[in-house]
């Protein structure tokens, strides 16, 4: 089995199959077109440039294409890149499966679904419980498969469910410490806050934004979904309004994508939990790629900072 692409060190040669995660056209300083390819396997992804790209290359090397590459790992402007020597699409005879290149959550789907179901079962408010159960059941297949984002955090198969399970465990610990919090409301907010991403995003492979995702966004999508669920379940109570507020405010500020700031205690905590879990995932993934005594690449979503791995962290 080939070494994972993220396990290669600078200076090593790569000769293996990879999946094109994304392909972006650019124009070099000499006026010639090139493609920026994000190539992935189950260990992560790496950027590569295809210089002097022909128009036909945009089709040949489109996202979701499996390719055989030969190249060298090197550093360029603080980032690890793959310098291509050769690249070609695979043939059917090579019998390579796209699933073999997809990074997945570290917890099996059935275990994550069991955890989410248990948190719903523990809810005591019937209105909150019914709405949450209804929406999870409606979108269960996508909920268990989709990533939480196209980049930055939990951007892998089942990343959305993994993000939610981690947040639920954080929510439980915080609610144990602060008993004045409404557990039902907080748990429901965690489970539903990003569920609109099953319509905002295209799916778990070469994830991009749908038309609905670009024009509306997952927050607006989920507020509408909540309203429809309440109507179908004939629930007309303040719980619906408060759940909608938790969805609307979970990004915290207008400049971060929330139409309203948190104005309910559980909404404030939801925002912190979401932010904490996303940032922990970003840091963990960046630090996995370096040895003790080294700095990570700059993490754009964390104010473009680098993080140091202490020498005593093996």
UniProtKB/Swiss-Prot annotation:
Q: What SUPFAM superfamilies does this protein's entry cite?
A: HD-domain/PDEase-like, Nucleic acid-binding proteins
- Domain HD, residue spans: 163-279
Q: Which InterPro entries match?
A: 3'-5'_exoribonuclease_YhaM (IPR020873), HD/PDEase_dom (IPR003607), HD_domain (IPR006674), NA-bd_OB-fold (IPR012340), YhaM_exoribonuc/phosphodiest (IPR050798)
Q: Which terms in the Gene Ontology molecular function aspect does this entry carry?
A: 3'-5'-RNA exonuclease activity; DNA binding
This enzyme's EC code(s) = 3.1.-.-
Q: Which domain of life is it from?
A: Bacteria
Q: Name one GO biological process term.
A: rRNA 3'-end processing
Residue ranges forming the DNA-binding region read 22-90
Query: According to its UniProt record, what is one Pfam family this protein matches?
Result: HD
Tell me, according to the record, the phenotype of the null mutant.
Non-essential, it can be disrupted. Correct processing of the 3' end of 23S rRNA no longer occurs in the absence of mrnC.
Q: Does the keyword ATP-binding apply?
A: no
Print the keywords alphabetically.
Cobalt, DNA-binding, Exonuclease, Hydrolase, Manganese, Nuclease, rRNA processing
Q: Which PROSITE patterns match?
A: HD
Query: Do you know what upregulates this one?
Result: By mitomycin C and UV irradiation which requires RecA; probably a member of the yhaONM operon.
Cofactor(s), names only, from the UniProt record:
Mn(2+); Co(2+)
Role noted for this protein: Shows a 3'-5' exoribonuclease activity as well as single-stranded DNA 3'-5'exonuclease activity. Plays a role in the secondary pathway of 23S rRNA 3' end maturation.
Q: Which NCBIfam families match?
A: PRK13480.1
Q: Which family does it belong to?
A: Belongs to the YhaM family.
Q: What is this protein called?
A: 3'-5' exoribonuclease YhaM
UniProt organism field: Bacillus subtilis (strain 168)
Give the encoding gene's name: yhaM
